[in-house]
Design a protein with these regions (language model features):
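Surface-exposed loops/turns
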Residues: 82, 144-145
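Aromatic sugar-binding surface patches on proteins
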Residues: 128-138
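C-terminal amphipathic helix plus adjacent low-complexity
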Residues: 1-102, 108, 158-161
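Solvent-exposed serine/threonine-rich low-complexity stretches and specific carbohydrate-binding patches
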Residues: 115-130
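Short, aromatic- and glycine-rich surface loops/edge beta-strands on solvent-exposed regions
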Residues: 145-157
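Short beta-strand elements
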Residues: 140, 158-168
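Hydrophobic residues positioned within well-ordered beta-strands of beta-sheet architectures
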Residues: 88, 103, 136-138, 150
Length: 168
């Protein structure tokens, strides 16, 4: 009880309603107000531009093609050594989306209760662009031994979206 009372006496004065409001303003309200001003400027020009971009991505998304995938046999067979670096390269035809695609390597592991968890997410870098063909590359290395699954995630990207979930 003495420890609890001491903790309340030492910590509680720092968590006031004023602090909560200050945190809210600095973390949320001010950022949202600035974003609104950007989107609403010039008769909502930026908002209309983003909406048109989203419609374009939706219209072309299913036509995106993976032209080639270059990875070593160990990755194809699932025999990855801990500590060894593997280079993975994908060439993707974005079908006119103009650098609107991002690619990630997602590594997962399964716990004893059968649940799958994300171990790491590594973004691919665009190393080359020829027309609509974008070459993505990542150097992948696992630092721990164990049983892992590797998959790839493709997603729409735009510097005007503050979060990936804003695409919806």
């Amino acid at each position: 009880i003495k420890v609890v009372k001491n903790s309340i006496a030492q910590i509680a004065p720092h968590y006031t309603m004023k602090r909560q409001l200050d945190d809210y303003y600095s973390k949320f309200y001010c950022k949202l107000a600035k974003r609104f001003q950007t989107l609403a400027a010039n008769d909502n020009a930026k908002a209309k531009e983003i909406a048109a971009w989203k419609e374009d991505v939706v219209a072309k998304w299913d036509s995106i093609e993976i032209v080639s995938c270059d990875k070593v046999e160990e990755l194809k067979n699932g025999d990855i050594e801990s500590g060894k670096e593997y280079t993975i390269t994908y060439v993707i035809d974005e079908k006119g989306l103009n650098d609107a695609v991002g690619l990630e390597l997602v590594t997962t592991y399964t716990t004893a209760d059968g649940k799958q968890h994300v171990y790491s997410v590594e973004p691919f870098s665009v190393i080359k662009k020829e027309g609509d063909l974008y070459t993505f590359q990542v150097v992948h290395s696992l630092s721990n031994a164990g049983s892992f699954k590797v998959s790839y995630r493709m997603f729409p990207k735009n510097p005007d979206l503050p979060h990936r979930q804003d695409f919806c």
